[in-house]
């Protein structure tokens, strides 16, 4: 690795660690509250509550099942996806590598929970006039931001490069 690639590698590693640590800190705080309270349902604003649920599925509780074979298969698949994301991050030489680092940091946070707790603690409850969005966590926020930014880069910047070549 040359100096620039090594610097980028360390910067990506820092991004992943910061996201992971921030996610773990928020989850540990909520879990500490759950030890004291019988249930965690904290009113913050008219549109935001902290409400702890345990997600055994994947994003937004999809495929939430109790079968250990299916659960283990999904967990292994998620681990392989994380490896693929890190590979894409390392192979990228542009701004996209930082978005892959955001996704990897969030994915590591949720993967850690799946391994340690066999479920992911979700606790951010956004709602508006009775409509509740899926309950999620900080890792999900960083994954979403990373994916959204990758889509924007692909739509607006990579598309321009393709048009300029033609």
Curated annotation (Swiss-Prot):
Its EC number is 3.4.23.36. It comes from the Bacteria. Pathway: Protein modification; lipoprotein biosynthesis (signal peptide cleavage). Keywords: Aspartyl protease, Cell inner membrane, Cell membrane, Hydrolase, Membrane, Protease, Transmembrane, Transmembrane helix. It catalyses: Release of signal peptides from bacterial membrane prolipoproteins. Hydrolyzes -Xaa-Yaa-Zaa-|-(S,diacylglyceryl)Cys-, in which Xaa is hydrophobic (preferably Leu), and Yaa (Ala or Ser) and Zaa (Gly or Ala) have small, neutral side chains. The active site is at 122, 140. One of its GO terms (cellular component) is plasma membrane. GO terms for biological process: proteolysis. It is a multi-pass membrane protein. InterPro entries: Peptidase_A8. One of its GO terms (molecular function) is aspartic-type endopeptidase activity. The keyword Cytoplasm does not apply. It is found in: Cell inner membrane. The chain crosses the membrane at residues 11-31, 42-62, 69-89, 99-119, 133-153. The keyword Membrane applies. Belongs to the peptidase A8 family. This protein specifically catalyzes the removal of signal peptides from prolipoproteins. PANTHER family: LIPOPROTEIN SIGNAL PEPTIDASE. This is Lipoprotein signal peptidase. It comes from Pelagibacter ubique (strain HTCC1062). The lineage of its organism: Bacteria, Pseudomonadati, Pseudomonadota, Alphaproteobacteria, Candidatus Pelagibacterales.
């Amino acid at each position: 690795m040359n100096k620039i690639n090594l610097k980028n590698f360390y910067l990506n590693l820092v991004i992943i660690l910061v996201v992971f640590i921030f996610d773990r800190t928020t989850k540990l705080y909520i879990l500490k509250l759950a030890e004291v309270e019988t249930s965690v349902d904290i009113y913050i604003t008219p549109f935001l509550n902290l409400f702890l649920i345990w997600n055994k599925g994947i994003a937004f509780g999809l495929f939430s099942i109790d079968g250990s074979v299916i659960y283990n298969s999904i967990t292994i698949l998620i681990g392989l996806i994380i490896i693929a994301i890190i590979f894409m991050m390392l192979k990228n030489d542009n701004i996209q590598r930082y978005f892959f680092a955001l996704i990897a940091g969030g994915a590591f946070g949720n993967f850690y929970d799946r391994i340690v707790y066999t479920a992911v603690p979700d606790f951010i409850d956004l709602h508006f006039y009775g409509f509740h969005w899926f309950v999620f966590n900080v890792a999900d926020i960083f994954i979403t931001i990373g994916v959204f930014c990758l889509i924007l880069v692909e739509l607006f910047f990579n598309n321009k490069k393709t048009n300029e070549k033609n």
